[in-house]
């Protein structure tokens, strides 16, 4: 009986391959199936670690949402900068018509190489996104934002006209079409979203994101970004303290949280993260206000240590590598070995 089943399965597989092409269906244990997910760094060491794979996954949809001025666009511009450092191509679909090239340049984005589109309608924005994805030549596409993807019927209609559920239908239709193309081209597509309040909610959070429920389902990673405080030097505000929660993660364990500093005109402070994580892992010793590395004092107060690491990039790079090895690479090797065991079990 088992032999007959095996023959029937082989016949079905060969028929599928003849009809739909080679690779239409395959065993997960086949070496041709990629088990490793490529990632693009977020520019934040803590967030890369919280995401579990060292960044945002390629070939997937990511949603970043939060209140106004919480750092959503800054985070995506940092992702573009990291992508360009790796020699990749990035596109920014500016539906809000609010992209500031000089600010992007300060964050390390090569603005001359960045593809930018300012579409007139939501349909146009999503069609451009689909065409860029299908080209398989773009590594990252950012859509800023879902709330600004206004359907054509709404733009061409009168001010007071009712268009119930039009944007949600548009998003649902577009994502059905986009998902397969994104996987095939291995492009990272990031949707920035805004928060709205649901009326009449008695229990639970009244917060919701715009554009219906489709994006919640199709996104492999959802990040909730919030501003939790200000960074001050006397009376002057230098930046904001930011918290990011990984609300959904299909590629690693979810619900991890991280905090980092966003400095105005500079972006995410890599040095501040190195200090915080270095102290946590005892790579940097903290005694009172003094910080030491390899028995040598490197500064009094966090701000002085940050300046020291900025002036000594080789020390910062050395510390970052130690932190990545300790918190990320060890976890990834454990995950890889456990997945190898799983695939071996499937093959058996």
UniProtKB/Swiss-Prot annotation:
UniProt binding sites for ATP: 66-73
Coiled coil: none
A biological process term (GO) from this entry: SOS response
Main subcellular location: cytoplasm
Keywords: ATP-binding, Cytoplasm, DNA damage, DNA recombination, DNA repair, DNA-binding, Nucleotide-binding, SOS response
Subcellular location: Cytoplasm
Entry GO CC: cytosol
GO molecular function: ATP binding; ATP hydrolysis activity; ATP-dependent DNA damage sensor activity; damaged DNA binding; single-stranded DNA binding
Cell cycle listed as a keyword: no
Keyword hit for Oxidoreductase: no
Transmembrane segments: none
InterPro entries associated with the record: AAA+_ATPase, DNA_recomb/repair_RecA, DNA_recomb/repair_RecA_CS, P-loop_NTPase, RecA-like_C, RecA-like_N, RecA_ATP-bd, RecA_C_sf
NCBIfam families registered for this protein in UniProt: tigrfam_recA
Family, similarity comment: Belongs to the RecA family.
Task of the protein: Can catalyze the hydrolysis of ATP in the presence of single-stranded DNA, the ATP-dependent uptake of single-stranded DNA by duplex DNA, and the ATP-dependent hybridization of homologous single-stranded DNAs. It interacts with LexA causing its activation and leading to its autocatalytic cleavage.
Descriptive protein name: Protein RecA
Organism: Legionella pneumophila subsp. pneumophila (strain Philadelphia 1 / ATCC 33152 / DSM 7513)
Gene name linked to the record: recA
């Amino acid at each position: 009986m088992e032999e007959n089943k095996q023959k029937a399965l082989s016949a079905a597989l060969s028929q599928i391959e003849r009809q739909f092409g080679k690779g239409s269906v395959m065993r997960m244990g086949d070496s041709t199936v990629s088990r490793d997910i490529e990632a693009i760094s977020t520019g934040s060491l803590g967030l890369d670690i919280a995401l579990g794979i060292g960044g945002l996954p390629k070939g997937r949809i990511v949603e970043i949402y939060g209140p106004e001025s919480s750092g959503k666009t800054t985070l995506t511009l940092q992702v573009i900068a990291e992508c360009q450092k790796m020699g990749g191509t990035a596109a920014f679909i500016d539906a809000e018509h609010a992209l500031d090239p000089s600010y992007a340049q300060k964050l390390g984005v090569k603005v001359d190489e960045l593809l930018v589109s300012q579409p007139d309608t939501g349909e146009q924005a999503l069609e451009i996104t689909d065409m860029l994805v299908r080209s398989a030549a773009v590594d990252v596409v950012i859509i800023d934002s879902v709330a600004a993807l206004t359907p054509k019927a709404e733009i061409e209609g009168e001010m007071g006209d009712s268009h119930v559920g039009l944007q949600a239908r548009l998003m649902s239709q577009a994502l059905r079409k986009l998902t397969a193309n994104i996987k095939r081209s291995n492009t990272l597509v990031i949707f920035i979203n805004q928060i709205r309040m649901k009326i009449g909610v008695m229990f639970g959070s009244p917060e919701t994101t715009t554009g219906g429920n489709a994006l919640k389902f199709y996104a492999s990673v959802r990040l909730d970004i919030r501003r939790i405080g200000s960074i001050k030097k006397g009376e002057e505000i230098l930046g904001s303290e930011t918290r990011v929660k990984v609300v959904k993660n299909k590629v690693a364990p979810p619900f991890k949280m991280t905090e980092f500093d966003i400095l105005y005109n500079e972006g995410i402070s890599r040095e501040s993260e190195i200090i915080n994580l270095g102290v946590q892992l005892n790579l940097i010793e903290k005694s009172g206000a003094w910080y030491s590395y390899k028995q040598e004092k490197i500064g009094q107060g966090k701000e002085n240590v940050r300046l020291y690491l900025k002036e000594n990039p080789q020390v910062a790079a050395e510390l970052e590598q130690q932190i990545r090895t300790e918190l990320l690479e060890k976890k990834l090797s454990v995950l890889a070995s456990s997945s190898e065991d799983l695939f071996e079990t499937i093959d058996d």
